[in-house]
């Protein structure tokens, strides 16, 4: 029996570990990682027609319309859908078994557009909510360091003064202050709760305790997914460590 491609959407507050868990899931389950932020930056840097339209909004300090962001994400999802269909028709073997999306949707309007698409091509899709306390977010973000070259994220407990990959001196984000972080948490809650309520009503929401260590969070996510939908592939668990297991590391994004 053919296994339905796995499609996950990962959501959570700043510092909840979305980036780390997305990398772990993509690596260990052979999922394509789709980041809406990366799609936006790539479109602008490549000066595509859509990128030019996005840049015009950003240059004016305006919020991007739901339909514009959806158009960008939809292009990528359509590529994924076409690839999945091709595999079914021609029995081609590809490394990806599905995809994980982060950074989208941010509004109920976006969620409805996405749901209409996914119900047609990935009907068993799930939303992974990384639920984390305000105190833990504050603790993580005030102790994180970033590589200005590769954008790798490390925490103070790891003891690095330089990026182990680039050998560039690590820096702090200027907005990683308690006051700004608390404001970002409140903004996240106000913007995201309606989206979470929408997905909860569709019975697609899986809530995971993200206060736990990275390794435990990852294992809890796997436990919450139907085993028939994935196969673990032992690879390097994320970009900031070289282990060949799926125990993860202590960095958080």
From Swiss-Prot:
GO cellular component, one term: cytoplasm
Annotated region described as NMP, given as residue ranges: 35-64
Gene from which this protein is expressed: adk
GO molecular function: adenylate kinase activity; ATP binding; metal ion binding
Free-text function comment from the UniProt entry: Catalyzes the reversible transfer of the terminal phosphate group between ATP and AMP. Plays an important role in cellular energy homeostasis and in adenine nucleotide metabolism.
Main localisation: cytoplasm
GO biological process, one term: AMP salvage
Subcellular location, record wording: Cytoplasm
Residues engaged in binding AMP: 36, 41, 62-64, 103-106, 110, 173, 184
Pfam families the record matches: ADK
Domain writeup: Consists of three domains, a large central CORE domain and two small peripheral domains, NMPbind and LID, which undergo movements during catalysis. The LID domain closes over the site of phosphoryl transfer upon ATP binding. Assembling and dissambling the active center during each catalytic cycle provides an effective means to prevent ATP hydrolysis. Some bacteria have evolved a zinc-coordinating structure that stabilizes the LID domain.
The UniProt record lists the keyword Transport: no
Positions of the UniProt region annotated as LID: 143-176
Sites where the protein binds Zn(2+): 147, 150, 163, 166
Similarity remark: Belongs to the adenylate kinase family.
Name listed for the protein in its UniProt record: Adenylate kinase
EC nos: 2.7.4.3
């Amino acid at each position: 029996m053919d296994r339905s491609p796995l499609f996950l959407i990962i959501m959570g507050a700043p510092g909840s570990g979305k980036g780390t868990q997305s990398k772990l899931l993509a690596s260990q389950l052979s999922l394509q990682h789709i980041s809406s932020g990366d799609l936006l930056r790539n479109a602008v840097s490549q000066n595509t027609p859509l990128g030019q339209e996005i840049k015009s909004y950003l240059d004016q300090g305006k919020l991007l319309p739901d339909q514009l962001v959806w158009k960008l994400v939809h292009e990528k999802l359509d590529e994924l859908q076409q690839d999945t269909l091709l595999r079914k028709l021609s029995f081609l073997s590809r490394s990806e078994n599905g995809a994980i999306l982060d950074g989208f949707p941010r509004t109920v309007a976006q969620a409805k557009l996405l749901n209409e698409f996914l119900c047609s091509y990935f009907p068993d899709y799930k939303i992974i909510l990384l639920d984390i306390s305000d105190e833990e977010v504050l603790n993580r973000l005030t102790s994180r360091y970033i590589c200005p070259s590769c954008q790798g994220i490390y925490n103070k407990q790891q003891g690095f003064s330089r990026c182990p990959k680039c050998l560039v001196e690590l820096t702090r984000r200027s907005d990683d202050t308690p006051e700004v972080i608390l404001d970002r948490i409140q903004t996240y809650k106000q913007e995201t709760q309606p989206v979470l309520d929408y997905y909860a009503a569709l019975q697609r929401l899986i809530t995971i305790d993200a206060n736990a260590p990275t390794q435990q969070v990852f294992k809890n996510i796997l436990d919450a997914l139907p085993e028939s939908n994935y196969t673990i592939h032992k690879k390097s668990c994320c970009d900031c460590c070289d282990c060949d297991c799926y125990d993860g590391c202590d960095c958080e994004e």
